[in-house]
């Protein structure tokens, strides 16, 4: 037996295409490219998209702990204090319909 029949040759090539294998024999340089394309893309690898923790979950958790008095966020405390002092001085943002444009019309 010298080689495969035409039918067997075409079927082997078709099965290689279906199952993501190399259809024709290639050199090592081309096999490197085939190997790169057969791997998952960088964006779909778990270590890439799971690199940073879920910010929304942690922010909600820390805010809940802050309101319960179990966590102290000095920066947020400072911002709240500044907002409170601004309101006492009468410098807070006007409510909707009470701004400069609305005052002109009255």
UniProtKB/Swiss-Prot annotation:
Q: What is its main location?
A: mitochondrion
According to the UniProt record, one GO cellular component term is: mitochondrial inner membrane
User: InterPro entries attached here?
Assistant: Ribosomal_mS33 (IPR013219)
Which residues lie in Basic residues bias regions? Answer: 84-94
- The answer on whether this UniProt entry bears the keyword Transport reads no
Q: Give the subcellular location.
A: Mitochondrion
Q: Which GO terms describe its molecular function?
A: structural constituent of ribosome
Q: Which residues carry this modification: N-acetylserine?
A: 2
Q: Spell out the Basic and acidic residues composition-biased ranges.
A: 95-106
List every stretch annotated Disordered: 82-106
Q: Which Pfam families match?
A: MRP-S33
Could you give a single Gene Ontology term from the biological process aspect? Answer: mitochondrial translation
Annotated signal peptide? none
Instruction: Report the family membership.
Output: Belongs to the mitochondrion-specific ribosomal protein mS33 family.
Q: How does it assemble?
A: Component of the mitochondrial small ribosomal subunit (mt-SSU). Mature mammalian 55S mitochondrial ribosomes consist of a small (28S) and a large (39S) subunit. The 28S small subunit contains a 12S ribosomal RNA (12S mt-rRNA) and 30 different proteins. The 39S large subunit contains a 16S rRNA (16S mt-rRNA), a copy of mitochondrial valine transfer RNA (mt-tRNA(Val)), which plays an integral structural role, and 52 different proteins.
What is the protein name given in its UniProt record?
Small ribosomal subunit protein mS33
Which source organism does the UniProt entry give? Homo sapiens
């Amino acid at each position: 037996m010298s080689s495969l029949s035409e039918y067997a040759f075409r079927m082997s090539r078709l099965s290689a295409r279906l199952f993501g294998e190399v259809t024709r024999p290639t050199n090592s340089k081309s096999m490197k490219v085939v190997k790169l394309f057969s791997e998952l893309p960088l964006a779909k690898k778990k270590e890439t998209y799971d690199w940073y923790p879920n910010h929304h979950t942690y922010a909600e958790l820390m805010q809940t702990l802050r309101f319960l008095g179990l966590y102290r966020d000095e920066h947020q405390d400072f911002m709240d204090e500044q907002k409170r002092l601004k309101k006492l001085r009468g410098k807070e943002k006007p409510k909707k319909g009470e701004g400069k444009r609305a005052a002109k019309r009255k």
